[in-house]
Regions:
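Cysteine-centered iron-sulfur cluster-binding motifs in ferredoxin-type domains/subunits
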Residues: 1-2, 61
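Short, well-ordered alpha-helices that flank and scaffold nucleotide-derived cofactor binding pockets
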Residues: 8, 73, 77, 178
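Distinct, well-ordered alpha-helical segments
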Residues: 69-73, 99-106, 168-172
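Hydrophobic positions in alpha-helices of CheY-like receiver
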Residues: 75, 105, 143-150, 176
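C-terminal accessory regions of radical SAM enzymes
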Residues: 178-215
Length: 215
């Protein structure tokens, strides 16, 4: 998907727009996959998987990366999820829980200590605007399925605060708590710094003061 607060260095969907607009951080080509089709690259990790204690998955989007599924399925084969103190952390846009023949929730059932951080900046139509490609109804369906099937896993929202949503963050937080999407403690914020034209600091003074008043 194309989130409005990132760019082609973090999302392949941004590449064509970045080339057309002459964005100054555009890679020479789309960043799609490390050594695509080269399974020998992933097999280098096999001897070390039995000793892994912590994994942090981020992206891009880890749930549509072949490398993610290769390693996680190997860990299941080794029995690491149930019999060891392995801790697993995700940052995901939480838009799609299936990939090819894989199902994330079925995978996660094999692990005891797993934390899912959903990168969500708003709800409804605004969520679909900020992270183009989002279908909010599907995000809700994914959350209810997760709560029903593996309620013991940690789930939290990681919200990027920018000029687009700084005046709505508090309402978004309350809404997510009110509908049971998260517990009150499960909400974190990232202040957008990398894309200066979209920082909250570009807003007029009266809007910045209103944001401060709300917080």
């Amino acid at each position: 998907m194309r989130c409005r607060t990132c760019g082609p260095d973090l999302s392949s969907q941004w590449f064509e727009d970045a080339v057309e607009s002459k964005y100054n951080r555009t890679p020479e080509q789309k960043i799609l996959q490390i050594r695509k089709g080269n399974t020998a690259f992933m097999e280098q990790f096999d001897p070390y998987l039995d000793t892994v204690e912590k994994i942090y998955w981020a992206g891009g989007e880890p749930l549509i990366m072949d490398e993610h599924w290769y390693i996680m399925n190997k860990l299941v084969e080794l029995g690491k999820g149930r019999t060891s103190p392995l801790r697993i952390f995700y940052n995901t846009n939480f838009s799609k829980l299936t990939y090819k023949e894989h199902d994330a929730i079925e995978l996660w059932k094999n692990f005891n200590d797993l934390s899912i951080g959903a990168s969500l900046d708003a709800s409804g139509k605004k969520a679909e605007y900020l992270r183009k490609g989002t279908k909010w109804s599907e995000t809700l369906e994914n959350r209810w399925r997760l709560k029903n099937e593996i309620p013991h896993h940690d789930f939290n929202i990681s919200c990027t605060v920018s000029m687009f949503n700084v005046l709505d963050v508090c309402n978004f937080y309350r809404e997510m708590c009110d509908i049971g999407f998260i517990e009150p403690k499960d909400f974190g914020v990232n202040i957008l710094l990398g894309k200066h034209i979209h920082r909250a600091t570009v807003l007029p003074k009266h809007m910045r003061e209103e944001a401060q008043r709300q917080i």
